[in-house]
Amino acid sequence: MTQSCTLTLVLVVAVLAALATAQLNFSAGWGRRYADPNADPMAFLYRLIQIEARKLAGCSD
């Protein structure tokens, strides 16, 4: 019984240590590094592609 309690305690400590390491390596800006704060160029390209797709669809008739 003592051996299983010791093993459980060691596993819990190992998991908590791994979680603490992960928290130390996390940075708040990580998820935002690929986000473009100015999405206007993306919207322009999207509209341009839509216009060209409509032109191509009109040519196939």
From Swiss-Prot:
GO terms for biological process: flight behavior; neuropeptide signaling pathway. The keyword Nucleus does not apply. GO terms for molecular function: hormone activity. It is found in: Secreted. The keyword Manganese does not apply. Adipokinetic hormone precursor-related peptide (APRP) can form three type of disulfide-bond dimers: p1 (alpha-alpha), p2 (alpha-beta), and p3 (beta-beta). This hormone, released from cells in the corpora cardiaca, causes release of diglycerides from the fat body and stimulation of muscles to use these diglycerides as an energy source during energy-demanding processes. This is Adipokinetic prohormone type 2. It comes from Locusta migratoria.
